[in-house]
Every structure is written in structure tokens, then in C-alpha cells.
């Protein structure tokens, strides 16, 4: 009797006695076929079916997969927060989780959204007024621009900067102000007072600029970007003054790459005069250099005749350039080799660079057709004949009167 009470209904017993239910393919079920889902997805006959039922099943599967992934991510984040709370306490754990990016911090616009939406119109009107006043004030000198940039940096360091400091501190906005002063829109403002038509024209012309200003981040982020540019310049050029680097950056429109190129060009021009890194770096010269076009390339000013190997190093010349003597620089040029100790000749210059993979210019290859670099004319036509012709007085009395090149090349008469 007790066994009959503990036994369930016959229908449930019949279902429990059979094998457990296995998942079936929904696409096959839509088309009247029952097939187990395990190992069947790749070989399903209706895996690419686009009927209404199969499309609905595919959409449900996609939504379910997204929900499972989201729940899994949320569970992982909750576990991490719980571990941090156990390690550091409740408040410290939440702060550390927000700092590490586990919990996204609440943005500021959610707290101050209503206040910013209410004061949007007032800020736009104030921006128009400050913009027009900044344009009518006239172009500023480099010293004033440097002072304004310094004041803008000091004001924007805590994150609270005034609109005037913001407009006066950036070089790109100063350039826009100069172009705006030269535009015909600002002429009625200079001649007469501010009329409603002029104000509306200013608003219509500069509406895109105001939209850009509204879309830009806060002035503190702009100031931090400017500070990053100044820090980059000070690290690249530690020997230059910070004020000069600020002026160069402001003259180049906050473009760090252009400022670096400008400083390198000016320092290269000063290096020829043997001047120090800070000598001649005046604000006027820097601003003039930033506005002037770059100097023409050296190839345009080069003479038509090939340059002498002694005039510059052989590393930037072709290996097939003719050899010409440069006697004042023979001793100082690192690409010369003293061969006169054995052959009674002045030091011969290499046709290839000393550190390259070329062969040294040796005397057995100087005849026509054997010398690899000068094989088109006889040796007398080349300009290095006087190099061979000038022999030292020390070896004149030795047995090399005929020389390796004959009496005509050596410009001496054979001794009888």
C-alpha cells in the first residue's frame, strides 16, 4: 500500500522510463522532419532556407545569443565587483572598479543636462559677443600672443577658463580672427556700431564655427592638448627656451610636425654660422620663418658641372663621379688614402665611399678601358691629371723619373 502511494501516475512513469528528451532541429521540424540537433547543424537540408518560419527561427536564435552574451558579461562584472568589495571594502572597491573601467562612471552630462540645456541660448549669445569683441580688438603682437597663451594655460589648468582667454590663447583662432578682420563682413563693424543685420551676418557666417566649438571638448582638454604639444617640443629640443618653442608652435598653428620642421630648418641655417642653439632665436625671426615658404632645394642651386669630391663627403654622391683634386682638403678628408709612400704620388682619392663596398682607386687600373669609373676618355682629359702630375720633392730623385704614367702625364722630362 505504501508502495502504491509513493508511485506516480502511469503517464509520468511511462515518460520517465524512456530516454530523456533530446533537442531537435527547428528548421527540419518546420518542414515536417524530425532530426536530432547534435551534429546536424552543418548537414541540415534547410540550413539556407529563407522561408518565413526559418527566418523567424534565425532571428530568435540571434536575439537569444545576444542575451546570453550580455548576461554572461554582466555576471562576470558582478563577480569582479564582489571580489573587489571583499578585498578593499564597499566604497573603496567601487571607486577602484570605476577607476579600472569595470564599472563605467556616470558622465557629467547626466547630472547637469538640464542646466546645460537651459543655458544653451545664453551661452551662444555670449559666445557671439566675445567673438565679435575679440575680432575688433585687432591683431596682436608676438609678445602679447605669448602673454595671452601663458595666461590661458594658467587659467585653464584647474579646468575653469574664461571665453576671452580661450579665444586669445590659441594660435589657430588668432589666425581665424585675422582672416575675419580682413573679410568684408567685419568692415561695417569697424566703420559703425553693431547693427542687427551685421550681428545676424556674423551669426550666419560663423555658425559652423560655433557648432564646432560646441562639439569640441572642454577648454581644459584643449589646454592639456596644447601642453602636450609644448612638452613634446621641449623634449625634442631641450636646448631651446620654452617661450621660444611656444611662439614657434603658435606661429605654426598648433601643428607640432610643422613646428619641428621649422626649428630644424632654422637650426640648420644657424649651424653654418657656428652659432649656438639659442643665438638669433628671436620671436620676430621665428614668426617670419613660420610664415615664409621653405627654402628651395639644394639641387636647383647646384652648378651644372659635377661637384668636387672634396667639396662634400662621398657618402651622398654617386660612385661614378669623376675624381678631381682638392689639395687644401686632402689632409682633412677621411676618404683619402696616403699612397705616396710607395708610389711617389700625392694621396689618391677613392672613387667610391670609404665605408662603402667599392674598390680603391689604384694605379694599375688607371689606363683607358681598365678603370671602372673613368673608361670613356684617356687619362689626360680628366681633371685628376694634375693630381698625378704633382709629385713630392722627396721622391723626385728616385728611380721613378719615367713614372707609371709616362713623362707626358707626369709633366716632367725624362732624365738622360
From Swiss-Prot:
Subcellular location field: Nucleus
Record bears the keyword Zinc: yes
Chief localisation class: nucleus
Record's compositionally biased regions (Low complexity): 197-207
Gene Ontology BP annotations: germ cell development; sex differentiation
DNA-binding region as annotated in the record: 25-72
Transmembrane stretches, start-end: none
Domain DMA: 227-262
One GO CC annotation: nucleus
Region (Disordered): 131-226
Compositional bias segments (type: Polar residues): 131-154
GO molecular function: DNA-binding transcription factor activity, RNA polymerase II-specific; metal ion binding; RNA polymerase II cis-regulatory region sequence-specific DNA binding
Keywords attached to this entry: DNA-binding, Metal-binding, Nucleus, Zinc
Family: Belongs to the DMRT family.
Function: May be involved in sexual development.
Listed name of the protein: Doublesex- and mab-3-related transcription factor A2
Phylogenetic classification of the source organism: Eukaryota, Metazoa, Chordata, Craniata, Vertebrata
Amino acid at each position: 500500500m505504501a508502495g502504491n502511494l509513493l508511485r506516480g501516475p502511469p503517464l509520468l512513469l511511462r515518460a520517465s522510463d524512456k530516454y530523456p528528451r533530446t533537442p531537435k532541429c527547428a528548421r527540419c521540424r518546420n518542414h515536417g522532419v524530425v532530426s536530432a540537433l547534435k551534429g546536424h547543424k552543418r548537414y541540415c537540408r534547410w540550413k539556407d532556407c529563407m522561408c518565413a518560419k526559418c527566418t523567424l527561427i534565425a532571428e530568435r536564435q540571434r536575439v537569444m545569443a545576444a542575451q546570453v552574451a550580455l548576461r554572461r558579461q554582466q555576471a562576470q562584472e558582478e563577480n569582479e565587483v564582489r571580489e573587489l568589495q571583499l578585498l578593499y571594502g564597499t566604497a573603496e572597491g567601487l571607486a577602484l572598479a570605476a577607476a579600472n573601467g569595470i564599472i563605467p562612471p556616470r558622465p557629467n552630462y547626466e547630472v547637469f543636462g538640464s542646466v546645460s540645456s537651459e543655458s544653451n541660448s545664453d551661452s551662444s549669445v555670449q559666445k557671439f559677443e566675445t567673438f565679435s569683441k575679440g575680432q575688433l580688438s585687432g591683431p596682436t603682437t608676438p609678445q602679447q600672443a605669448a602673454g595671452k597663451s601663458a595666461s590661458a594655460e594658467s587659467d585653464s589648468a584647474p579646468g575653469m577658463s574664461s571665453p576671452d582667454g580661450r579665444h586669445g590663447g590659441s594660435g589657430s583662432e588668432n589666425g581665424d580672427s585675422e582672416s575675419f578682420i580682413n573679410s568684408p563682413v567685419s568692415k561695417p563693424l569697424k566703420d559703425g556700431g553693431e547693427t542687427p543685420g551685421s550681428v545676424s551676418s556674423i551669426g550666419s557666417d560663423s555658425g559652423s564655427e560655433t557648432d564646432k566649438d560646441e562639439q569640441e571638448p572642454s577648454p581644459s582638454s584643449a589646454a592639456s592638448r596644447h601642453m602636450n604639444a609644448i612638452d613634446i617640443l621641449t623634449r625634442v629640443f631641450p636646448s631651446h627656451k620654452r617661450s621660444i618653442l611656444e611662439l614657434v608652435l603658435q606661429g605654426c598653428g598648433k601643428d607640432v610636425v610643422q613646428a619641428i620642421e621649422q626649428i630644424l630648418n632654422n637650426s640648420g641655417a644657424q649651424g653654418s654660422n657656428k652659432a649656438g642653439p639659442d643665438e638669433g632665436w628671436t620671436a620676430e625671426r621665428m614668426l617670419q620663418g613660420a610664415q615664409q615658404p621653405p627654402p628651395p632645394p639644394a639641387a636647383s642651386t647646384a652648378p651644372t658641372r659635377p661637384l668636387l669630391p672634396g667639396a662634400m663627403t662621398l657618402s651622398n654622391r654617386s660612385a661614378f663621379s669623376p675624381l678631381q683634386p682638392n689639395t687644401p682638403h686632402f689632409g682633412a678628408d677621411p676618404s683619402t688614402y696616403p699612397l705616396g709612400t710607395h708610389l711617389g704620388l700625392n694621396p689618391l682619392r677613392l672613387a667610391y665611399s670609404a665605408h662603402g663596398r667599392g674598390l680603391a682607386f689604384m694605379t694599375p687600373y688607371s689606363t683607358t678601358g681598365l678603370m671602372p669609373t673613368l673608361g670613356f676618355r684617356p687619362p689626360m682629359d680628366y681633371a685628376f691629371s694634375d693630381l698625378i702630375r704633382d709629385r713630392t720633392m722627396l721622391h723626385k730623385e728616385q728611380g721613378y723619373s719615367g713614372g707609371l704614367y709616362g713623362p707626358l702625364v707626369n709633366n716632367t722630362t725624362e732624365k738622360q
